[in-house]
Regions:
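Structured mid-to-C-terminal alpha-helical surface segments
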Residues: 1-181
Length: 181
């Protein structure tokens, strides 16, 4: 049994807000909360990808249209640059690190560059080469962001012992490659 526990608007800062649905799945005495974000009018470059998920208790699959990896990365990289030192979303940093390291063989840098440009256009942001480097340098030098990372690391078991320096090395190298070159 599924129960929607909360629906709220997300991405209100953009012209195309979406919604986040908090859902609780119940099976006998098991309870599993999860969330689904639904947005419209995003710049998905080159297009949505169909993912098939096999159901646990039925012999069938369901299909979900979703972002491709390049668009997901482009949106997170744009957010990292746009928010700079004001970014409190450590999950964005973690996601970029994890995707770039675990799925690098599935990522097309040509598509990623196009997705980044499309995301910036959609979000009405632009970043010059000098601005990109300055923003990344400020992020690297900021002890407040490092402390937020350390807190994020402590409360999220999946982060393991990943250091802020390791995360930044991946982020800086990849953002510079797609946003500067």
């Amino acid at each position: 049994k599924f129960k929607i526990t909360l629906v709220k608007e997300i991405m209100e800062e953009f012209n195309y807000p979406g919604i986040r649905m908090m859902i609780e799945a119940n099976l006998e005495r098991m309870r599993q909360p999860f969330k689904i974000d639904i947005s419209t009018d995003d710049a998905i470059t080159p297009g949505a990808v169909e993912y098939k998920y096999k159901l646990m208790f039925e012999n069938r699959s369901i299909s979900v249209l979703s972002y491709n990896l390049e668009t997901l990365l482009a949106e997170k990289m744009q957010t990292i640059l746009a928010r700079g030192l004001a970014n409190t979303r450590m999950r964005d940093f973690y996601d970029v690190y994890e995707i770039m390291n675990s799925k690098a063989d599935q990522i097309s840098f040509d598509v990623l560059k196009k997705a980044f440009a499309a995301t910036c256009m959609k979000r009405e942001t632009s970043f010059g080469e000098e601005e990109v480097r300055e923003t990344l340098d400020k992020i690297k030098d900021d002890s407040g962001l490092e402390e937020m990372w350390n807190r994020f690391n402590r409360v999220n078991y999946f982060v393991d012992d990943l250091s802020w320096g390791e995360v930044l090395e991946t982020i800086v190298d990849n953002i510079e490659e797609i946003a500067v070159s």
